[in-house]
């Protein structure tokens, strides 16, 4: 009896806890060591190359996501290991152009219509079915509703809205640039424009970012939602219990606050969504009015997709044009000789400007607004990619940044050269089909035509009215972290108004 009492005395109890803890650590370590060895030598993907840590565990991918360098890191892996890389035990990364169709296209003649999205991506956001997160039927249903707003007729009817905001953008630049003597942060300026445009198109009211020269609170909050999604993905690649610990303690508190703010701002804005959007839903829905949660999530999707990605591309275009004066001069000459005055610049006539179109394509290639992987899951029966059978349950994807910047796809991939899209023989071996900046297949970006119109119009009017000069301190501006979207620093530019 005394020995039992001694065992459970303070010192004895601590010894038991220590022993159990050590035993747990040993068993835990041995378990994951065994898993790692299995992944390296016996897993169905064991033959695929990749970093040792990435082949053995998900830690490489989790670390890369958490650091915000997954786009650049994946490119480095492809340059080292080739066109197919194993970036996690159960995930393969591809960069060959033909795999856009194989992974993201319609799966004709199969028992399934598409490769579904990796649930680890959407587990970090609310499970409300939307055009992004819904299954095939849900996606098709919502896409049909929204497609009317992005039809050729609707875009033509809305062109005057683009002109209104782009003209206001040019006016504000003239007022604030002080004849080119004052530096402007074009990262913010482009966000002012694109957020005002999408705010009006989505909610039927202006957010007055251009007139106030102030970013709406929603912008920062919206970007924090994107950061949360990336960090949530990182957590899901960690083993238990570190996934729970990471989500609880490693995600910055300011990110959580901004996500809450984003939710509150959405609640305020929802009542102002144009009635034609809700009416379209009622017309097509068999269940009556659109659920509030679905309406709210689609408002978020339209706002994020229609503002941040377009602003990112325009900022990237400004940077690369500033870094490459000969390209800027060619573009300015084309625009200024094609149009006698500003009033002649229309979306239809901009299709005549071949160098402008090539410049936009090259910007999308060298600085894609959505740089990272969009993983799909292989169905249980498996698929064939690169003449190799990929078993069910494996994640596969085409990371845009890696595919667009790979030396196996593009000649001098780090060179900003619109000429590669104009038949220059120097770039004749480019695999131009690798460039799919709006994704591919039935889930490609619904707003891509609107984005092209806004980008072409804004860029054309910028170079028509201004000579731009990039501040040398922004020479490495494009070396950015990415958490779903790029985290863009200030882009300081002097704008010199062109004399009439």
UniProtKB/Swiss-Prot annotation:
GO BP, sorted A to Z: biosynthetic process
Database matches in Pfam families: p450 (PF00067)
Positions bearing carbohydrate: 99, 185, 373, 409, 482
Gene3D superfamilies the UniProt entry points to: Cytochrome P450
Pathway membership: Secondary metabolite biosynthesis
A molecular-function term among this protein's GO annotations: oxidoreductase activity, acting on paired donors, with incorporation or reduction of molecular oxygen
Cofactor: heme
Keywords: Glycoprotein, Heme, Iron, Membrane, Metal-binding, Monooxygenase, Oxidoreductase, Transmembrane, Transmembrane helix
PANTHER family the record matches: CYTOCHROME P450, CYTOCHROME P450 MONOOXYGENASE ASQL-RELATED
Protein's name according to its UniProt entry: Cytochrome P450 monooxygenase hepD
Organism: Aspergillus oryzae (strain ATCC 42149 / RIB 40)
């Amino acid at each position: 009896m005394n020995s039992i009492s001694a065992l459970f005395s303070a010192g004895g109890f601590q010894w038991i806890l220590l022993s159990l803890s050590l035993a747990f650590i040993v068993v835990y370590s041995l378990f994951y060591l065994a898993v790692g060895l299995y992944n390296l030598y016996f897993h169905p993907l064991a033959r695929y190359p990749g970093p040792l840590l990435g082949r053995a565990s998900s830690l490489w991918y989790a670390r890369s996501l958490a650091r915000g360098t997954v786009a650049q890191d994946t490119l480095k892996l492809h340059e080292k290991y080739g066109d197919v890389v194993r970036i996690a035990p159960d995930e393969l990364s591809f960069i060959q152009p033909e795999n856009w169709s194989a992974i993201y296209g319609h799966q004709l003649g199969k028992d399934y219509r598409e490769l579904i999205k990796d649930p680890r991506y959407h587990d970090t956001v609310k499970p409300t079915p939307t055009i992004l997160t819904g299954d095939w039927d849900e996606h098709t249903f919502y896409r049909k509703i929204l497609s009317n707003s992005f039809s050729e007729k609707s875009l033509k009817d809305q062109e005057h809205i683009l002109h209104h905001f782009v003209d206001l953008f040019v006016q504000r630049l003239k007022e604030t640039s002080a004849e080119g003597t004052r530096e402007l942060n074009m990262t913010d300026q482009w966000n002012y424009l694109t957020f005002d445009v999408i705010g009006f198109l989505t909610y039927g009211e202006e957010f007055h970012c251009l007139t106030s020269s102030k970013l709406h609170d929603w912008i920062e909050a919206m970007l924090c939602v994107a950061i949360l999604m990336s960090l949530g993905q990182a957590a899901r690649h960690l083993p238990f219990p570190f996934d729970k610990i990471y989500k609880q303690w490693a995600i910055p508190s300011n990110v959580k606050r901004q996500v809450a703010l984003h939710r509150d701002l959405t609640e305020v804005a929802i009542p102002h969504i144009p009635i034609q959007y809700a009416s379209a839903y009622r017309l097509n829905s068999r269940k009556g009015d659109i659920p509030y949660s679905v309406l709210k999530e689609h408002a978020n999707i339209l706002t994020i997709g229609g503002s941040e990605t377009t602003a990112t591309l325009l900022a990237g275009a400004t940077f690369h044009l500033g870094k490459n004066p000969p390209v800027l001069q060619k573009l300015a000459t084309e625009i200024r000789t094609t149009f006698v005055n500003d009033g002649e610049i229309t979306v239809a006539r901009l299709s005549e400007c071949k160098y402008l179109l090539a410049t936009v394509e090259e910007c999308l290639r060298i600085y894609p607004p959505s740089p990272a992987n969009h993983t799909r899951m292989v169905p249980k029966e498996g698929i064939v990619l690169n003449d190799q059978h990929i078993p069910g349950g494996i994640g596969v994807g085409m990371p845009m940044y890696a595919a667009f910047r790979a030396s196996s796809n593009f000649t001098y991939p780090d060179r900003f050269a619109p000429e590669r899209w104009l038949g220059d023989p120097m770039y004749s071996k480019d695999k131009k089909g690798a460039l799919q900046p709006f994704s591919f297949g039935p889930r490609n970006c619904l707003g891509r035509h609107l984005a092209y119109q806004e980008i072409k119009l804004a860029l054309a009017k910028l170079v028509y009215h201004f000579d731009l000069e990039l501040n040398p301190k922004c020479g490495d501006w494009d070396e950015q972290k990415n958490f779903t979207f790029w985290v863009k620093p200030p882009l300081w530019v002097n704008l010199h108004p062109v004399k009439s």
